Every structure is written in C-alpha cells, then in structure tokens.
Amino acid sequence: MEEMKRYPQVPGFSEVELAAFLAQPLLARLSTHNTDGSIHTIPIWYEYRDGKLLLSTQTITQKVKNIQRNPQVTVLIDSNTMPYAGVMVVGTAVLDTQNAAQKRVTIFERYIGQHGGTYAQQLAAKWEPVIIEVTPERILSFDYTKGSLVPNA
C-alpha cells in the first residue's frame, strides 16, 4: 500500500487515527464499474481488519458481477456530519465465499449488535453470501475536525 495521502486543503488522518476512524460502524459506499462504463455505487456495511476492508453481500448482486469483470473499486467512508472526516480507499477487490456466512456475522454485529448472527443466517438461507475483500492501493483521508476553511456547524 502506498503512503496515506491527504487532500491539500484539509488535514488527514495518521495511521492510528485511520484505524480508530474505521473501527466505527459507519456506512461505506462501494463503487464498481458497470459494463457500459458508468459507476455503480451502493451503501454497504464493512469491517476493517488487518489493513483490508471486508464488505458483506450476496453473490447475486450487481456489485459482485461488476467485480468479477473488473476488480478495481473505490470505497468512501465518512462521518456524514459536520465537521466532516473520512477516507477514500482505491483498491482491488477479491470475492471470498469460503466461510462467508460466518465471516459476515462480525460485520453485522458491528451494526446491529447481538442480532447480527441471526440476520446473517436468515440472509444465507436465501442467498449465497460473499465477502468482498478490498486491498487498498491508495488511501486518501480528510479530517475537518482538525480545522479547515469550512466553518464548524
């Protein structure tokens, strides 16, 4: 992975701040490439583990079809409240179906607590689960809580 980059107009995260930020159960936005060249962007739950983003979905989804054709993806995770902070990850996605139903339990529990396992089982009973593992090639961060040209709200 390249060194973390920052936008020129605003401070970014340190490595420690990045890990702390990504430990929060924020909503990620995954962008993949459609066959016509347009971008397909969807909200998705994630977990940051061992320097990679793990995203949970089903094999029948458009995002999975897109990744099968072109594994280059972008993921945006931000605070969604002022003063804003966030991370944009550009990387390569790998689809992992090995024990995906179990792996997604920890992701679901980050967002819905003790019911995560039940929800994961219900989805797996209907559709084959898959973990999208994103290996970052470039990370850009922004942290307006450190000051910027944007006034605090």
Stretch-by-stretch model annotation:
Residues M4-T32:
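Short, conserved active-site entrance elements at the starts or edges of catalytic domains
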Residues T61-K63, M82, S148-L149:
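Short, surface-exposed beta-strand-loop junctions and turns on beta-sheet-rich folds
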Residues M4-V10, I60-D78, Q114-T118:
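Short, solvent-exposed cationic patches
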Residues M1-F13, A85-A153:
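Charged, gly/pro-rich active-site loop segments
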Residues L26-L27, Q72, G116, I139:
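Generic structural signal for secondary-structure transition and capping sites
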Residues A19-A20, W45, K65, Q122-A124:
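Short secondary-structure boundary/capping segments
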Residues L18, I60-K63, K103-I107:
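Amphipathic alpha-helical interface surfaces
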Residues P25-T59, I67, V73-I77, G86-M88:
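Short beta-strand segments
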